[in-house]
Regions:
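Surface-exposed, charge/polar-rich loops and edge strands
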Residues: 2-178
Length: 178
């Protein structure tokens, strides 16, 4: 059994509301065990008899079920608990800096992650500090500027919606149960 973490994009914002209990019920209905939802921002941890080679099929299955049940254009990033733990531990910036947000951008496709890393390389590192990680991009924008920095605007492009989602480091710690 593998412990998976589903990170749903765009849940409980822009009119897309999914209650945690409904999300848990959906995942249990798909045959997953040990289902736990964390916070109300589209985070769920569960176990399934699917290893990492089956990730793409598992992702597609969950997205299809979300679309059918909640009638919205569902996108998720699916990581194992070990991958999430590694991404959290490797955060390269000062997570306790009160003036900045400690973000981790998860990418379900390597090409997308690479494109974000390449784009970030041309930006001002003071305004948009980023750092590449395994399957992720770390980002530490000033508080209150998430949507208006060049990197923030880049992340908001429609082309990245199906393959990326951003989480605060504190949320990731809660997902891991620490």
């Amino acid at each position: 059994m593998t412990t998976w973490v589903a990170l749903l994009r765009g849940v409980n914002v822009n009119g897309i509301t999914i209650r945690s209990a409904d999300l848990a019920e959906l995942l249990r209905g798909l045959g997953f065990d040990d289902v736990k939802t964390i916070l109300a921002s589209g985070n769920a941890r569960f176990t399934a008899d699917v290893d990492v080679q089956g990730r793409a099929e598992l992702k597609a299955r969950i997205e299809r079920a979300l679309r059918e049940r909640f009638d919205y254009d569902a996108w998720i990033v699916l990581v194992t608990d070990r991958e999430l733990e590694a991404a959290t531990r490797a955060y390269p910036f000062d997570a306790d800096d009160d003036d900045r947000q400690p973000y981790v951008i998860f990418c379900s496709e390597t090409a997308v992650r690479d494109a974000l890393v390449d784009a970030a390389a041309s930006l001002d590192p003071e305004e948009d500090p980023t750092h590449p990680g395994f399957g992720v991009v770390y980002w530490s924008p000033e508080k209150g500027r998430t949507l208006d920095t060049p990197f923030g605007k880049l992340l908001g492009r429609a082309e990245y919606k199906p393959t990326t989602t951003t989480r605060n480091l504190r949320t990731l710690v809660k997902i891991l149960g620490r």
